[in-house]
């Protein structure tokens, strides 16, 4: 079983990592190709392309200039310890043990516009390049064209290392990022957990809570060494509970109702 997550825009390179073990991303050459194109852009062009402030554009202009195909402790940090958004607050990798992170290496993957597909302990140099960015490149009009089938092929290769009964992909990524995966070419079924909160008289997806819950679920799977999707139904962190009536074979719905 493999759980896929989206990356985060915010990054933490201030907190020292609590583990030394690290790996190098599989698609460094592809990332270098993208960086080469990004280096041709001015800060103003970056701001327009990514719809970000001038300050953020200048920061990323500098990041692209400093990016190196050589990764080390001086310029990079393990992905799940560097990402710092809602999902990663839920996953809270800095409190996972070395054994937990070793397990996550084989069962968690992060989709990335720049790096394609990351293992939790893959070293990450700071960047910003969302998967949905319409960045024209030699392979096509955007990053979906750039990555093509490569991400799906990499997931298939990892899935084949699992026992047949455990070959399932759990989609805890956003729609923007999961579009980089091609389910028809995936050699495993896909299960998508959905997290809903009660608000305004009905259950609905609230983005902040749903993102955090995806991280919580990934952590739950890692800490409990889950290898079958039905085990996810017991997830009950922070008040969520599996709703069988609202779910089906490919969508697991978890709901939470707290006092308004």
Swiss-Prot record:
<comment type="similarity">
    <text>Belongs to the UPF0246 family.</text>
</comment>
<dbReference type="Pfam" id="PF03883">
    <property type="entry name" value="H2O2_YaaD"/>
</dbReference>
<dbReference type="InterPro" id="IPR005583">
    <property type="entry name" value="YaaA"/>
</dbReference>
<dbReference type="GO" id="GO:0005829">
    <property type="term" value="C:cytosol"/>
</dbReference>
<dbReference type="GO" id="GO:0033194">
    <property type="term" value="P:response to hydroperoxide"/>
</dbReference>
<protein>
    <recommendedName>
        <fullName>UPF0246 protein Bxeno_A1262</fullName>
    </recommendedName>
</protein>
